[in-house]
């Protein structure tokens, strides 16, 4: 099987890493791409994946928010993950600008894209 690089955590063929450094959404997406050539801000496709990511974010960040790779800053109405995956799993909590996920229960909230939150990066192994 594929081993994630040092410092990354593996779940069902994907690698994840939480960074304890706040930045805006655009910088966070660029930051993830710099960490690994296939990496983007995290996208969620199942509740199991959500539980895994919460288990990684909460111990580091406690009660806070992480950026997800979901925004509508480029295309009105079209919602897709920044890594190009289609939106097939949803947990909305309102209107979207850029989306954050709570570190405690993965409730999704919209936030101004210029606010600073923590990146969680993900890529397919």
Swiss-Prot record:
Stated name of the protein: Snaclec alboaggregin-A subunit beta
Keywords for this protein: Disulfide bond, Hemostasis impairing toxin, Platelet aggregation activating toxin, Secreted, Toxin
Expression across tissues: Expressed by the venom gland.
The protein's assembly and partners: Heterotetramer of the subunits alpha, alpha', beta and beta'; disulfide-linked.
Compartments in which it is found: Secreted
Function as written in the Swiss-Prot or TrEMBL entry: Potent platelet activator that aggregates platelets via both GPIbalpha (GP1BA) and GPVI (GP6). Induces a tyrosine phosphorylation profile in platelets that resembles this produced by collagen, involving the time dependent tyrosine phosphorylation of Fc receptor gamma chain (FCGR1A), phospholipase Cgamma2 (PLCG2), and LAT.
Family: Belongs to the snaclec family.
Gene Ontology cellular component terms for the protein in this record: extracellular region
Alphabetized GO MF terms: toxin activity
Pfam family, one: Lectin_C
Record has Iron as a keyword: no
Domain C-type lectin: 1-125
UniProt organism field: Trimeresurus albolabris
Disulphide connectivity of cysteines: 4-15, 32-121, 98-113
